[in-house]
């Protein structure tokens, strides 16, 4: 993760601790680099924190403090439940979460070795038995979303790196998988909607939420909005009973698909779904696919969410012969002036933000199996046939032809 003139790096998934570490303690190594000089990179030091890190938003550097949000025992080694270590303590107690603050020791090597990142503060035992689903650090505050059956939003005061404390907590149904700061007092999130009775998750529902954190000791859910790309038939009141499969949005796990445009207070989210339907005219069943970009008004003044419109790429499926293994779903979007551009593997559309009418489109050739895959096989068979014919005539394919020019072979 790059933060101004600092680069924080963590190793990719490492399974050594999971299978061979007898201490049963998962940990993440953190490496810091100074990249303020464009001509060189300076290694600052390394440190270690307990647990594993969710993503780049779980790491931050602010005024010399490196803040890391992590979950310990995230993999839940349930088969060790009830077993004790050599000291009689339980080996597995369930996952736990923490925010650790590191400082670069620099030239002061009295406490620890030079080039080390030492722990100066920590908040431990945040939401026992839950795991971190999203995190964000903004100035001297940290925000965490943990989940087991319900989604608590945690607000952490990091103004004193030596004594970080939890300021507030809010339990809301569902879970947020990405936190986007609109301003210092407002958070915009995307995630999965709640299941029945507000517990668990309904993976068929993508949910947008708006949080008011102006009072960090009492964060509130200002508004939430479930969104779906499916439409309701005339004879169906609930899209979940009309045969639609779970809808999904790449923005729930890839922040690059989450497009918020502050000048217009607009949010763009791609969504897709499908269903298996019966065509009474052709007397056949077929798949019906939907790919849309949902636009949402984010009213910061009144702290509310509302639908602005949508961009539909569903027709691109009709032009895609290989939709079953390619991606016609909208992947990215960008606001430019008074227009919204939507991108999928099959095309690009341009829509007016004023009335959402389409002003232009560009079709992109779909993916297809390389033609040489079959041609190579056919060529090999043809060469094999030629070799057989040459052998029958009593000469090898690489030998000169009986009546050919000097140096020419039969294969030529």
Where are these regions (language model features)?
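Feature marking well-ordered beta-strand scaffolds used for ligand recognition
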Residues: 4-412
């Amino acid at each position: 993760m790059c933060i101004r003139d600092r680069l924080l790096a963590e190793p990719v998934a490492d399974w050594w601790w999971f299978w061979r570490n007898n201490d049963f303690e998962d940990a993440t190594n953190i490496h810091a680099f100074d990249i303020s000089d464009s001509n060189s990179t300076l290694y600052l030091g390394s440190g270690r924190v307990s647990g594993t890190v969710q993503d780049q938003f779980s790491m931050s550097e602010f005024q010399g403090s490196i803040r890391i949000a992590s979950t310990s025992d995230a993999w839940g080694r349930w088969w060790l439940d009830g077993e004790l270590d050599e000291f009689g303590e339980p080996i597995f107690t369930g996952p736990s979460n923490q925010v650790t603050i590191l400082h670069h020791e620099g030239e002061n090597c009295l406490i620890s070795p030079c080039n080390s990142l030492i722990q100066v503060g920590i908040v431990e035992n945040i939401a026992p038995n839950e795991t971190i689903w999203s995190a964000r650090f903004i100035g001297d505050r940290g925000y965490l979303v943990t989940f087991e059956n319900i989604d608590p939003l945690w607000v952490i005061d990091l103004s004193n790196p030596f004594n970080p404390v939890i300021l507030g907590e809010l339990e809301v149904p569902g879970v947020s998988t990405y936190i986007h700061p609109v301003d210092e007092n407002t958070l915009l999130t995307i995630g999965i909607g709640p299941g029945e009775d507000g517990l668990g998750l309904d993976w068929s529902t993508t949910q947008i939420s708006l949080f008011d954190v102006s009072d960090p000791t009492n964060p509130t859910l200002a508004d939430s909005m479930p969104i779906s790309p499916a439409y309701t038939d005339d004879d169906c009141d609930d899209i979940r009973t009309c045969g639609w499969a779970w809808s999904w949005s790449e923005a729930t796990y890839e922040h690059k698909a989450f497009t918020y445009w502050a000048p217009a207070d607009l949010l763009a989210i791609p969504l897709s779904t499908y269903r298996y339907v019966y065509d009474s005219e052709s007397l056949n069943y077929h798949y019906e696919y939907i790919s849309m970009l949902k636009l949402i008004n984010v009213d910061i003044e009144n702290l509310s969410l509302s639908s602005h419109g949508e961009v539909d790429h569903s027709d691109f499926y009709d032009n895609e012969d290989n939709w079953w293994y390619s991606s016609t779903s909208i992947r990215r979007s960008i606001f430019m002036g008074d227009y919204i551009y939507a991108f999928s593997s099959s095309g690009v559309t341009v829509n007016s933000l004023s009335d959402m009418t389409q002003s232009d489109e560009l079709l992109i050739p779909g993916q297809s199996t390389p033609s040489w895959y079959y041609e190579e096989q056919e060529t090999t068979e043809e060469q094999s046939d030629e070799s057989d014919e040459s052998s029958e005539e009593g000469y090898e394919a690489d030998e000169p032809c009986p009546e050919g020019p000097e140096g020419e072979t039969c294969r030529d």
